[in-house]
Structures are given as C-alpha cells and as structure tokens.
Amino acid sequence: MSWIKDQVILLTGGGSGLGLALIERFIAEGAKVGVLELSAEKATALAHCFGNDICVIHGDVVSFEDNERAVAETVRCFGKLDCFVGNAGIWDHKISLLDASPEQIDKGFDELMGVNLKGYILGAKAALPALTASEGSMIFTLSNSSWFSGGGGVLYTASKHGAVGMIRQLAYELAPVIRVNGVAPCGMPSDLRGAASLSQQDRCITDNLSLESLSAILPLQFIPQPKDFTGPYVMLASRANNRTLTGVMITADAGLSIRGIRQTTAGVMSPTKKESSDDR
C-alpha cells in the first residue's frame, strides 16, 4: 500500500540524479508531481517521459516569480499541493579559500547561496499558501556537507550548513500547520554541476569524486545510487507515517556520519598537503 497515493508534490531540480529518482518514486507510489526545472532540454524530456502524471515548469529557483508560477501551475494541473521538495542545487568542486580568488569568492558566494539556500527559501515562500490550505509539508535536500567539512569547498559547505538553520527556523515558524524536514544524502553518481561563476558549469560531481574512494569510506561499503535515497522523502511526505516529525534532518549517508569524511587531521595548508600539491 502506498504511503503517498493521491498526494501532489512539487519538486525543484528534477531533470537528473536524485531529483529524477524522486520523481520516479513519487509517481510509482501514486502521487502526482510538479517540477521546476532550469534546463529546457531536461524539462521537455520529463514531460515526454511521465505524461499526465507530471506538470513541468521551466524556470529558475532563484526567481520568486518562477517558484510562484510553479506552484500555480501544479495546483492548476492537479488541484492542490501536499508537499514541497526543495532539491535543486549546485556544487563547488571543493574549491578552497586558499585557491579561490576574491572575485571567485564574491561571485561564487552569490551563486551557491542563491541556488542552494535562497532558492529553498523562495520555494518555501511560494508554496506557503497552498501548503497552509492542505496542512502539508516541506522537505529539503541537505548533504553530508551540512554536518562535516571536506565534502565540498567553503562556499558549498556554508550553503548546506545554512540550510540546516533554515529548516529548524521554518519548522518553528510554520508549526503546527506545516511540517518541515530535511534529508542529507552522501555523495552519489549524478549530474550535479558546479557553479558557472567558478567556470564549473560543465563539470559534474563525478568528475571530481571517485565513487570507488567514496565506497571505501562508507561503512556500508557500497556506492549508493540516487534511488537508494528516496525512501526517507516518501516517509516524511506521508501524513499517516509522519505525524510527529518536524525540524528533523535524516542523515542518509550509508554510515558516513559514524566515522567522518576524512581520516587525516591535516588541512589544505599542512606541509604534507603542500608537498603533495607541489609534486603535481
């Protein structure tokens, strides 16, 4: 029996990776899905693939008007909104404070914070009236970088730490009507791109992240696929199975949090690291 049958869920960033896996899972569970997608090509592919089960809106999460339009179109297509999932994000390919120029920090900060944090807040604001009417929920995608250093650079890590505070504050503000939670996956093979302001827009996370090295540090010793992370979202969206959770962040990281990201205590400025860098 489905936990979210007949629900209507609006998701941001659904063209690939975790977002696409969530769409597939939600529809398989009997839900209807609205998607706000930046890529026109991916938006067209989604509409073609999922037909009447999906409402695709081409737009940008950093625009309140696009978020508002996504909510309106989803409600127009399916009559209501039960859950908003903030999922669109970009990475920084671990660019450090040491390596980033002042200009990169300035522009990269605006872009990373804009997509990864401002986009979540604007989506929440746009979805608020419809979710108030349905007494629904919000779910936001976090990261192991929401808790630990080393999973991204200073800009990405700051944006994901910021999302934790946002979830807690929204859970406080929107209770008792709307539940607000998060899911923090570890790394996975996906098309997660870097920031254009850092000239990383054509690089995806797997260009920088070795999946074999990821598997080696995960206590569960396997490479998680995007579909492996979808279960917590279904549970959090379910009214029957989640009456008590708000302000909760589920760490779905194959055990990474019980051992941390790095074994070494040396930072990027350590002599060992510098020698290794010089050798290259």
UniProtKB/Swiss-Prot annotation:
Residues spanning the signal sequence: none
Source superkingdom: Bacteria
Q: Does the keyword NAD apply?
A: yes
| Alphabetical keyword list | Aromatic hydrocarbons catabolism, NAD, Oxidoreductase
Q: Which amino acid positions bind substrate, per UniProt?
A: S143
Q: Name one GO molecular function term.
A: 2,3-dihydroxy-2,3-dihydro-phenylpropionate dehydrogenase activity
Q: Which reaction does it catalyse?
A: 3-(cis-5,6-dihydroxycyclohexa-1,3-dien-1-yl)propanoate + NAD(+) = 3-(2,3-dihydroxyphenyl)propanoate + NADH + H(+); (2E)-3-(cis-5,6-dihydroxycyclohexa-1,3-dien-1-yl)prop-2-enoate + NAD(+) = (2E)-3-(2,3-dihydroxyphenyl)prop-2-enoate + NADH + H(+)
What Enzyme Commission number(s) does the record list for this chain? Answer: 1.3.1.87
User: Which residues participate directly in catalysis?
Assistant: Y156 (proton acceptor)
Annotated GO biological process: 3-phenylpropionate catabolic process
Annotated pathway, please?
Aromatic compound metabolism; 3-phenylpropanoate degradation
Q: Which PROSITE patterns match?
A: ADH_SHORT
InterPro entries per UniProt? BphB-like_SDR, Dihydrodiol_DH_HcaB, NAD(P)-bd_dom_sf, Sc_DH/Rdtase_CS, SDR_fam
Q: Which family does it belong to?
A: Belongs to the short-chain dehydrogenases/reductases (SDR) family.
HAMAP family given in the database record? HcaB
According to its UniProt entry, the function of this protein is described as: Converts 3-phenylpropionate-dihydrodiol (PP-dihydrodiol) and cinnamic acid-dihydrodiol (CI-dihydrodiol) into 3-(2,3-dihydroxylphenyl)propanoic acid (DHPP) and 2,3-dihydroxicinnamic acid (DHCI), respectively.
PANTHER family to which the protein is assigned, alphabetical: 3-OXOACYL-(ACYL-CARRIER-PROTEIN) REDUCTASE (AFU_ORTHOLOGUE AFUA_6G11210) (PTHR43180), SHORT-CHAIN DEHYDROGENASE_REDUCTASE FAMILY PROTEIN (PTHR43180:SF66)
What NCBIfam families does this protein's entry cite? Answer: 3PPDhyd_Dh_HcaB, PRK06200.1
Q: What is this protein called?
A: 3-phenylpropionate-dihydrodiol/cinnamic acid-dihydrodiol dehydrogenase
Q: What gene does the UniProt entry assign to this protein?
A: hcaB
